[in-house]
A protein has these predicted regions:
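A conserved beta-strand-to-alpha-helix junction within the catalytic ATP-binding
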Residues: 96-114, 127
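Short conserved segment of the HATPase_c
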Residues: 177-189
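Conserved C-terminal segment of the DHp
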Residues: 50-60, 64
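Short helix-loop "hinge" at the ATP-lid/N-box region of the Bergerat-fold HATPase_c
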Residues: 149-150
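Short alpha-helical segment of the dimerization/phosphotransfer core of two-component systems
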Residues: 71-76
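Conserved micro-motifs of the catalytic ATP-binding
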Residues: 91-96, 126, 130-133
């Protein structure tokens, strides 16, 4: 009789340990996220405050300083928008799926890039592929991956999108993002992200949207010189 009681006790201890481990992991991730978000919001707020104070002592610079304040306000709004998107990407929310032609869908991003940065070589190589997906979550995934490629590479560096079977590959001419092989989503070079005008929150959106869609992602070095991201649908 003692053996079953012992086994039951061991099972309870194991379950409690697993629960606590999951809670600790979630708490750690939340703490890191809040720390990163606070840091990102603090930077534009500091700039806004600095230029606001200089306005009182140097009224001749009103136009220049006001433009800088407006620029940082827009940046802060974009950061807040990303934070709201991250909060909205709840894995428990059911996906609103529909069937789309992926090659046609990707073409709009190529067209946008050519308008935004006409000097950048942009190429799409894709065969037709029908997939069933949540379009809003997919938009979050693809737009942030392309935004990372655009922000973290020179304006004349190439960005290539290719669709091979059910694999979508997005790569850029670099230097791209720093890849951490064992934990590709955690702690990308965020200081460099801020220097390039990014918020450092894009990878959180990519991670959450990829997980919600159930797609497999791999990161590596592109032959173009930058980052290569492979997504399997």
């Amino acid at each position: 009789c003692a053996l079953p009681i012992f086994l039951l006790g061991a099972l309870i201890v194991t379950l409690l340990f697993r629960r606590d481990s999951k809670l600790n992991s979630a708490a750690r991730q939340m703490q890191e996220f809040i720390g990163d978000a606070s840091h990102e919001l603090k930077t534009p707020l500091t700039v806004i405050r600095g230029y606001s104070e200089m306005l009182t002592s140097n009224p001749n610079k009103v136009s220049e300083y006001s433009a800088r304040i407006n620029s940082e306000s827009i940046r802060m709004t974009n950061i807040i928008d990303k934070l709201l998107k991250i909060a909205a990407l709840d894995e428990t929310n059911p996906l609103q799926t529909r069937e789309i032609e992926l090659s046609d869908y990707l073409q709009k991003y190529v067209n946008d890039l050519k308008i935004l940065q006409p000097n950048r070589p942009v190429k799409l190589q894709a065969n037709p592929l029908q997939i069933t997906t949540d379009l809003e979550v997919l938009d979050t995934l693809i737009s942030n991956l392309i935004s990372n490629a655009r922000i973290h590479s020179p304006i004349d560096a190439p960005i290539h999108l290719s669709l091979e079977g059910r694999n979508l590959i997005i790569e850029d001419g670099g230097p791209g993002l720093k890849v951490i092989p064992d934990k590709p989503f955690q702690r990308f070079d965020q200081s460099r992200s801020r220097e390039s005008g990014g918020s450092g929150l894009g990878m959180s959106l990519i991670q959450k949207s990829a997980k919600q869609l159930g797609v497999k992602m791999e990161f590596g070095k592109s032959e173009l010189g930058g980052l290569k991201v492979s997504i399997t649908f």
